[in-house]
């Protein structure tokens, strides 16, 4: 039998904010998901989907009242078999596309320590800063570099993100006997203790008691679960949480990152997480689970290969989930892409294609360039290995480290002479995939791309950006037509910077990017940089402020609904009324939520004859409107009447439709034709005939058609 499923989601912003579309994506599986937990642990029944996807972040009372409804069961994502133990092999891929040079310290050591042909495209080395603000870099255990105590991250990032960020590193882990929650010490495996100890050395937030508790709960939930290489699944959970910590996520988000697969892959339920960690964490984990389910559905239907539908899917996904759940899903996908080698070549291609078309654009829409670059380069490596290797070698051979070092010294002296202080002056390199895409799009050779080599300068304020630009143009010849003022005219995702291309020694083009600290924060971390941002401390253009607030409001729609009837949750977790747009109080949950009143359009996923399409409907569309568009010949039942037998009726959020005028809302799930076993066809033949007769009667003038009995 034909099964048609519809998922309706709004894509437009609230009327008072910027209407620029955003993108996101995720993983959906409507088949049964098996659990590989210990046999001694009974599996909790899945919670039903009530109100469709719009109930992802509904109140606990709503969730409880819906327990009698039917639910989808989910299936294991192929990524559950991935592993992560080759940190040395992957360290070159874990960096962003920018890196720095020190005139003396790393001239000889860079090539010796980084033999990978693509290391020059990903690995930061050293930065030059004007006294007394010169910064040192310390190497993390995960292969990335972090600025020192007086550096960029501990300076403007903490100021921008407030208590949401903790970039301090601590070497002292919390002792077991200091914890306030009970822990089965004897049952904890040695590898888990070591994993936590190493995580605590990499980031201080893993010393937080709630994070430690989540770690041990994740260990218990995934105990015995292994990836394809037989490495513990817990390692993936830790790496996902570490990625979140490294972009400034607070303990709530890191805890949810550790637990992100527990609902799908273990005995844990939403209620279990709610009791142990509160509604905030439980909602995030459930949100990630639903995003994974949707992405699975899109992947199975090859939506990523359909440009228009993929773009609609990005926008639709952005409108359905808490931003923090979106970031957790992105971190999950980024780590899975780093360990994609564990899958078969066919699956590698499929996941890389989906990541390139869905997840990388999502990271771009949210402005998280560090993740976008890594995702794109990893996809490039798996989708086009020959081109990847060829370009890596070509760029390694053509890379002129001495030229970059000389340019840094020259600009440093000129800035000092002009009295312009700065925070960072470093070399940067365009990413492999970005170069490849530009060559294809504009039909250029590598020699014709002017922004492969470059410098990045971070100054105090907007005025200094333009002063520094004048200094740059006084040192080198400007390439006509290559000046781009993204400060006055920001990109759609809020990116701001000055870009210019100059000729060094008349032969080698050199791109120079100039921005403020706040602009750099926006460029690197995008939406994530503004979870707790105080707008009063930064002079952003009104456009960028709109984009920041739009990201806050668009990522979920349920703010006002969540503020009602949360009697089962402690007062500390209760939802306050949303602040007036666009400002928010420090702890206002509305900083993650959009206005709940949306006025269209509605994006709808329609699955029919095992094919999925993403369609757009006007606001206030009804089930009848959807059926009219589908047409009478597209399914087995008549659009003019609905049978009395509930088994044959279309279903809205698992409930048989009783009124065709029901409006499609954000996240509604509509099954146009339930699957009927062949042995039941005889039983329903009479009912199907009545449906057909009703359709004929409807076509006669003046005939009213009811439900029939």
Swiss-Prot record:
The organelle targeting sequence, given as a residue range: 1-63
Gene3D superfamilies per the UniProt record, alphabetical: Beta Polymerase, domain 2 (3.30.460.10), Hypothetical protein af1432 (1.10.3210.10)
Domain HD: 233-337
Subcellular localization(s) per the UniProt record: Plastid, Chloroplast
Source domain of life: Eukaryota
GO MF assignments: ATP binding; GTP binding; GTP diphosphokinase activity; kinase activity
Tissue expression from the record: Expressed in roots, hypocotyls, shoots, cotyledons, rosette and cauline leaves, stems, petals, sepals, stamens, pistils and siliques.
Induction behaviour: Circadian-regulation with a peak at noon. Induced by wounding, salt stress, 12-oxo-phytodienoic acid (OPDA) and abscisic acid (ABA).
Translocase among keywords: no
Matches recorded under InterPro entries: HD/PDEase_dom, HD_domain, NT_sf, RelA_SpoT
Reaction it catalyzes: GTP + ATP = guanosine 3'-diphosphate 5'-triphosphate + AMP
GO biological process annotation, one example: response to abscisic acid
Gene Ontology CC terms: chloroplast
Principal cellular location given in the protein's record: plastid
Pfam families: HD_4 (PF13328), RelA_SpoT (PF04607)
E.C. no: 2.7.6.5
Intrachain disulfide bonds: none
Alphabetically ordered keywords of this record: ATP-binding, Chloroplast, GTP-binding, Kinase, Nucleotide-binding, Plastid, Stress response, Transferase, Transit peptide
Family to which this protein belongs: Belongs to the RelA/SpoT family.
Biological role stated in the UniProt entry: Possesses ppGpp (guanosine 3'-diphosphate 5'-diphosphate) synthetase activity in vitro and is able to functionally complement E.coli relA mutants. May be involved in a rapid plant ppGpp-mediated response to pathogens and other stresses.
Protein name: Probable GTP diphosphokinase RSH2, chloroplastic
Annotated organism of origin: Arabidopsis thaliana (Mouse-ear cress)
Upper classification of the organism: Eukaryota, Viridiplantae, Streptophyta, Embryophyta, Tracheophyta
Gene name in the database record: RSH2
């Amino acid at each position: 039998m034909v099964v048609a499923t519809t998922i309706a989601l709004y894509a437009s912003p609230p009327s008072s904010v910027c209407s620029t579309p955003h993108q996101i994506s995720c993983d959906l599986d409507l088949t049964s998901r098996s659990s590989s937990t210990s046999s001694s642990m009974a599996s909790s029944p899945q919670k039903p989907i009530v109100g469709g996807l719009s109930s992802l972040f509904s109140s606990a009372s709503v969730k409880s009242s819906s327990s009698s409804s039917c639910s989808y069961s989910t299936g294991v994502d192929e990524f559950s078999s991935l592993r992560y133990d080759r940190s040395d092999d992957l360290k070159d891929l874990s960096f962003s596309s920018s890196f720095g040079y020190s005139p003396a310290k790393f001239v000889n050591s860079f090539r010796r320590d980084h033999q990978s042909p693509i290391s020059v495209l990903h690995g930061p080395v050293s930065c030059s800063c004007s006294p007394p603000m010169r910064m040192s870099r310390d190497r993390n255990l995960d292969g990335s570099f972090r600025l020192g105590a007086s550096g960029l991250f501990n300076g403007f990032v903490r100021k921008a993100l407030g208590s949401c960020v903790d970039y301090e590193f601590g070497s002292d882990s919390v002792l077991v006997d200091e914890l306030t929650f009970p822990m089965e010490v004897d049952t904890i495996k040695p590898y888990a203790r070591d994993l936590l100890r190493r995580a605590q050395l990499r980031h201080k937030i893993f010393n937080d008691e709630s994070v430690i508790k989540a770690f041990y709960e994740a260990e218990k939930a995934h105990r015995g679960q292994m990836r394809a290489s037989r490495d513990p699944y817990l390692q993936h959970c830790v790496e996902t949480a570490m990625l979140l910590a490294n972009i400034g996520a607070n303990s709530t988000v890191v805890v949810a990152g550790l637990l992100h697969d527990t609902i799908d892959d273990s005995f844990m339920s939403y209620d279990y997480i709610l009791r142990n960690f509160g509604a905030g964490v439980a909602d995030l984990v459930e949100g990630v689970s639903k995003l994974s389910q949707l992405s699975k559905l899109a992947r199975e239907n090859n939506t990523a290969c359909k440009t228009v539908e993929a773009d609609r899917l990005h926008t639709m996904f952005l409108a359905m989930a808490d931003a923090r759940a979106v970031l957790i899903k992105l971190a999950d996908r980024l780590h899975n892409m780093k360990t994609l080698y564990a899958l078969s070549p066919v699956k590698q291609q499929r996941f890389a294609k989906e990541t390139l078309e869905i997840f990388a654009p999502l990271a771009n829409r949210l402005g998280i360039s560090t993740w976008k670059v890594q995702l794109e380069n990893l996809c490039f490596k798996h989708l086009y290995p020959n081109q990847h290797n060829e370009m890596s070698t070509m760029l390694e051979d053509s890379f002129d480290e001495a030229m970059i070092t000389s340019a840094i010294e020259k600009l440093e002296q000129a800035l000092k002479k002009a009295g312009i202080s700065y925070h960072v002056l470093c070399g940067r390199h365009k990413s492999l995939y970005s170069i490849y895409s530009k060559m294809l799009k504009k039909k250029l050779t590598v020699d014709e791309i002017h922004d492969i080599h470059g410098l990045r300068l971070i100054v105090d304020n907007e005025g200094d950006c333009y002063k520094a630009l004048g200094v740059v143009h006084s040192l080198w010849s400007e390439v006509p037509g290559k000046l781009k003022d993204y400060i006055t005219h920001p990109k759609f995702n809020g990116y701001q910077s000055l870009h210019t291309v100059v000729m060094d020694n008349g032969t080698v083009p050199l791109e120079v990017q100039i921005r403020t600290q706040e602009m750099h924060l926006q460029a690197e971390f995008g939406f994530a940089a503004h979870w707790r941002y105080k707008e009063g401390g930064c002079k952003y253009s009104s456009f960028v402020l709109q984009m920041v607030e739009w990201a806050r409001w668009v990522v979920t729609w349920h703010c006002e609904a969540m503020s009602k009837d949360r009697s089962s949750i402690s007062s500390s977790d209760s939802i306050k009324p949303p602040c007036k747009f666009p400002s928010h109080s420090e702890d206002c949950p509305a900083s993650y939520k959009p206005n709940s009143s949306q006025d269209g359009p509605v994006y709808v996923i329609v699955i029919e004859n095992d094919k999925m399409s993403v369609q757009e409907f006007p606001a206030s569309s009804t089930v009848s409107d959807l059926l009219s568009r589908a047409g009478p010949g597209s399914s087995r039942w008549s659009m003019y009447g609905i049978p009395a037998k509930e088994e044959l009726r279309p279903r809205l959020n698992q409930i048989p439709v009783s009124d065709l005028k029901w409006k499609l809302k954000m996240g509604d799930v509509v099954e146009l034709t339930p699957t009927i076993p062949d042995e039941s066809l005889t039983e329903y033949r009479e009912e199907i005939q009545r449906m057909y007769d009703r359709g004929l009667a409807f076509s006669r003038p003046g005939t009213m058609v009811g439900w029939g009995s």
